[in-house]
Amino acid sequence: DIDDIVWYGSVDSVKDMAEAVGVANTTNMKGLKTICNNALREHKKIHFLPPYRADIKIQIFDLLGIHPNQQKESASMDLIHAVVKMRSVKTPEEIEELERAAVIGYKMHTTAMILAKPGVTEKFVGGQVDGIAHSYGSMVAFPTIFSQHGEIMHGNPSMAVLESGRLALCDAGAETINHYCSDNTRTFPVNGKFTQRQLDIYKVVEECHDAALKYAKPGTKYADVHFAICHILFDRMKELGLAKGDTNAAVAAGAHAMFLPHGLGHMMGMDVHDMESFDQINVGFDEETRPNLEQFGTNCLRMGRRLEEGFVVTDEPGIYFIPALIDEWRAKKHCAEFLNFDKLDEYKDFGGIRLEDD
């Protein structure tokens, strides 16, 4: 199309690109419309995946007459399961591409550590981190999180000035030209030196992070790894005077979610939350492992199924002190037998710490 060439330059045709990867037949959108109309007339099953992009939702509406609000429930479960099976186990070539993304991600994070100084804005550091991704021929895998408010899970950079004595949390990753992603988080003191209180919490998160790496083996349910980490975390919170009671009972009641209100990790690949548009219950779980959607924190567990060789998952424990959550649980006396609210009040200005690797 000459208009496309004028605006975007010459590109390979769909036919040429398809032939290069072994696809025998291609057509334009008009031809696809005819194919779909014939299939609908013959009452054939048309398989499609849950769309993520708005323009694809419009195309499905034009092709199949399915309203965007009904497309997720109309998507093919057979195709979803087939694609999840195919994409869950990464090939050596995919692992190599993920490693390439990880190398760029490392440069992004070390840049943040170098530039984060008292007097610099969060926006400045976040912008430089993004620039590193672009300068190495990639893009950011997701909007970079860089904030002194680590207790906010997705705290985007603001014009707030970095202050001595506070912690900065950086959650960032690169997406390569072939669309494979990295996703790492580091938390560090703005002035380069932890206070004792910060170091105490950091060491707990680090212990949980390292334990997850040790426990995560082929054949192990990732949900079991998650809850093993929750037990370690709660034991350490008891040692610091922030929690109390029987650890097994506390974790069963969900008391650990005061500190860790999310799951241990998620699948990685061509999406930073790989295949998330298929619904995490279809990606991170199976008939053997089902999430508890009723319990706060546990309902955010994205990955619970048995690990297989070739899976790529994140390991991202954290400890967060969220003032609104502390106040709400205190008012409701939720898990009061397991939490020391007076001590928790002393940590309302702490923020949060997360450590994440793929």
Residue ranges and their predicted role:
Residues 1-358:
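Active-site neighborhoods and metal-handling regions in enzymes and metal-associated proteins
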